[in-house]
Amino acid sequence: MHIGVLALQGDYAEHANMLEANGAEVSEIRLPDQLDDVDGLIIPGGESTTIVQLIDIYGFRNKLVELASDGFPMWGTCAGMIVMANELTDHRPDPLKIMQIKVSRNAFGRQIDSFEENLKFKGIKEDFPAVFIRAPIVISTSDDVEILS
């Protein structure tokens, strides 16, 4: 499987390294036409306002929305999830509106309020050590969104 990692801003290198360590073929995606060569896309964490600005500057928005409507697999972590959301509680950034969720940015407060928590994930036997750093929280989902943890 060939996975693309949107490499405009944020922790794209960490995502790419982890995927490669687990046997995936990985490409860092910097231009919209590179999406034609991958089987799925990860939009990594980083700063959501900056990521959205770069998505628009580099002309990704229409391509990502089109791919999502065609069922192209995408995963967003932290800021990536914010970018994909249908609705935000904040007035910015303007998300892609490709995942039917409502998200509150920085819901866990300031940087000093960051914490770690072991989570149970559907399909994973062992608890997963999750780090919440000024993390967003999903306020609501549509009925067709599957909650994994």
Residue positions per predicted region:
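Flexible, glycine-rich phosphate/dinucleotide-binding loops
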Residues: 12, 35, 83, 90, ...
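Structural signal for conserved beta-strand scaffold positions within catalytic alpha/beta enzyme cores
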Residues: 5, 28, 76, 97-100, ...
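Residues at the C-termini of beta-strands that transition into short coil/loop
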Residues: 7-9, 30-32, 100, 107, ...
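N-terminal beta1-alpha1 cap of cysteine-dependent amidohydrolase-like domains
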Residues: 1-69, 73, 122
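Amide-donor transfer/coupling interface in amidating biosynthetic enzymes
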Residues: 105-149
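Cysteine-nucleophile active-site neighborhood
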Residues: 48-120
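Structural motif
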Residues: 40, 72-73, 97, 129-131, ...
